[in-house]
């Protein structure tokens, strides 16, 4: 897509200039944030996630509304150090996690995220941030746009991230939804996050003192990220 193709509201985590944060700003923030988001499925991460959920759940209902999630992302995780588009990113993550969680359970609370979906939401936010760092690395000329050659050179990194591509040109053209010959961050992130969640995303399966213990046990979740992408 062209520079004009991306929706300003969806400019989540665009590069310096569009986002108001520079590549250097994001790199520094990412080193802290990647450790602050407890998205893994080991015992320590589960314990941290339970505690974080309780901190987010200011009303003590065992369910999080969007405002509670956004407030927690600002006040507790301080994710705004990475991007000036945090509300857009959190809204996407909130909706995605809620929808996927409801699909797994067969039921779900409308406009609320329960503990079962909490890990999904954290994974989605983490993935968007990780994608931004990756896009910074792939976009070698700093044009805010990804060209086919840059995309081809990044295939090994994409494979590490969980997306194995055999026909780079065909996939690139699929991502380039308006056929402009270049890919914006929004086009790239929408494609890549969907691919990654299909491969790796799954809800939490532990109980947190409520009634969430019937969650899916679909796998071990998102693999360890490449730190500097």
Swiss-Prot record:
Record protein name field: Flagellar calcium-binding protein TB-1.7G
Biased composition (Basic and acidic residues): 16-25
Pfam family, one: FCaBP_EF-hand
GO cellular component entries: cilium; cytoplasm; motile cilium
Top-level lineage group: Eukaryota
A biological process from GO: calcium ion transport
Binding sites annotated in the UniProt record for Ca(2+) 2: 139, 141, 143, 150
Domain EF-hand span(s) in chain numbering: 44-79, 80-115, 126-161, 163-198
Positions bound to Ca(2+) 1: 57, 59, 61, 63, 68
UniProt KW keywords: Calcium, Cell projection, Cilium, Flagellum, Metal-binding, Repeat
Classification via Gene3D superfamilies: EF-hand
Chief location of this protein within or outside the cell: other
UniProt biased composition (Low complexity): 210-221
Domain-related comment: This protein has four EF-hand domains, three of which may be functional calcium-binding sites.
Signal peptide per UniProt: none
Role played: May contribute to the rapid motility of the trypanosomes, playing a role either in flagellar structure or in calcium metabolism. Could alternate between a GDP-bound inactive form to a calcium/GTP-bound active form.
Subcellular location: Cell projection, Cilium, Flagellum
Family: Belongs to the calflagin family.
Disordered: annotated segments: 1-25, 202-229
GO MF annotations in UniProt: calcium ion binding
Positions that bind Ca(2+) 3: 176, 178, 180, 187
InterPro entries, per database record: Calflagin-bd, EF-hand-dom_pair, EF_Hand_1_Ca_BS, EF_hand_dom, FCABP_EF-hand
